[in-house]
Amino acid sequence: MKTIGIICEYNPFHNGHAYQLHTLAQQHPDTLRICIMSGSFVQRGEPAIFSKFDRARWAVLGGADIIIELPTIYSTGSAQLFGTGAVRMVKALAIDALSFGSETADLNALINIAKHMDCESTQAQLRTYINEGMSYGTAFRKALHTEILNTPNALLGLEYIRAGLAYNPKLQYIPILRTSNHHEESITNELPSGTALRQLITSAGNLSYQSITSTGNLSSQCITSTGNLSSQLQSTIPPSIASDMIQVVDNGNYVNYNRYHDMVHSLSRRTTPKELDKFGDFNEGIEHLWSKAAQQSSWTAATEEIKSKRYTYARLQRMGAYLTLGITKDVLQNAMEEGPQYARLLAFNDRGRQWLRNKYEIPLIQKWAKAPNELSTLGQTMHHIDTLATDIQALCFHNESNRIGHKDYTYTPQYIK
């Protein structure tokens, strides 16, 4: 085994991620650690809190050797689409093994469950439960008679194995036992959840940045907030990246989610039900309820009106991303059938340099501007959506000077020595 793939989002990178990479380095010291990372948008159906360029740099500083971007079509997809796209990229890049966080380290149990996911009886029960109004995850949990699927990441782990069985039978799996609760909202230890960190950065960072820009000076409240943020980040982020991340927050180079939500809400108001119907996941007449809810005072209020067991908040978020990025049902279907059309290099270190010289099933892109010339029609669509995702994310940054478009075209893969 020469290479291990890690499918990740690093939204943001923290001690839990460093723990996984460190564990792999100890267990497989001579093996390259290649991360397939969500880019400007993540599976929650919204922009990542930091740019993919910052997150890729931090990942290498935190123990990864190579960072490859997962195209936005997959990174904003359902668990099945996300997992399938990532695993097919792992195969296209000839990566030997796949490591992922899991609520159980019992690999045989996970493989056994994954094998039953596509059985006719399981699929029949799944359809029945979904027709009763259950979410995809809940319906699968009941159809498979297992409680392992009680978190989003547990479902993703099974989707990786499911995709591997279908597209990459020789792929090895290395589950790493999780050390934090996926949705824990408080910073209770040195291994926090991504949710807790995003909330910390958003609340404390908003106060400090807004205070600086509005007054030109730091208020006592702002100083306290900034100090608390710095202290808490330093206890939850690897020392190699803590000061860098704090500087990025201080510069306002992170997402203001209110700006993004207003963008989705505005698009929802100007798009007719007939137009909504062409975008991913708009089925069963929900486009009419969506248009009606768009008259609410905010995107948050609109989702509260639409939300149901079947249409969870996460699913509605993804639908909002499809609308914002112009991702249609046809594009999603083609992406599921054909798989990733390229692998975009974001960052690497000395250990990863040799690997970059190899040839793979899909183009390894280092120069974004030249890429469309060597891509298929679907690849060009993916390229356009990735560019748009970065541009939309940039528009949502706190600092106006960081809202410049087409950053993808000026970015060079980072060589971290």
List the predicted regions and their residue ranges.
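Active-site cores that bind ATP or allylic diphosphates and position pyrophosphate for catalysis
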Residues: 70-417
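Acidic, Ser/Thr-rich peripheral helices and adjacent loops at domain boundaries
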Residues: 54-57, 353
